[in-house]
Amino acid sequence: MLSVVKPLQEFGKLDKCLSRYGTRFEFNNEKQVIFSSDVNSEDTFVILEGVISLRREENVLIGITQAPYIMGLADGLMKNDIPYKLISEGNCTGYHLPAKQTITLIEQNQLWRDAFYWLAWQNRILELRDVQLIGHNSYEQIRATLLSMIDWNEELRSRTERSP
C-alpha cells in the first residue's frame, strides 16, 4: 500500500501563524457542516482535532481524514467553484479565517515553503487515491480502500454510523 506522511512540522508553523486570527469552532460528538462552498467558499479552515469527511454535491464521499488538516489554503489565490462540504464526524475543533488574509499572513511571515509543502502533500494524497481507483475493478477498489483504512485510528475504523 502506498503511504505518504502528513507534513506535521509545516502544519505547526502554519497553525502558529494563522491561529491568532481565526474564528474558533467546536462540535461535540455531532455531525456538522463545517465548510460549504456555497456559504463560506472564501475561507481557509484549519481542523485541530477530530475526524472530518469531504463530500461533493449529492453527498458523494470524496474522502475522510483525521486532524490536523487545512482546507482552502489556496482559495485566496484561485477561486474554487466545485461544490464541496466539509463535515465533522464526531468531536471536532478548529478555526477559520478569510482566505485572502491567509495568503497575506503567509506572505508576511515567509511561510510559502510550508504552504507549498502542505498543498503538495494534499495533491499527492489525491493522486494516490486516483491510482488506487481509476482503471481498477470493484474488488481492487474496495481492497485499496480497506488497506488505506488501516492507517485510520481505532475510533474512526469502528464507526458504523452512516453519513447524512
Residues covered by each model-derived region:
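Cyclic nucleotide-binding regulatory domains
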Residues: 32-90
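A small-molecule sensor/coupling module
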Residues: 101-141
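A short, Lys/Arg-enriched amphipathic alpha-helix from helix-turn-helix/homeodomain DNA-binding modules
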Residues: 139-152
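Cyclic nucleotide-binding regulatory module and flanking cytosolic helices
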Residues: 1-33, 41, 69-70, 75-76
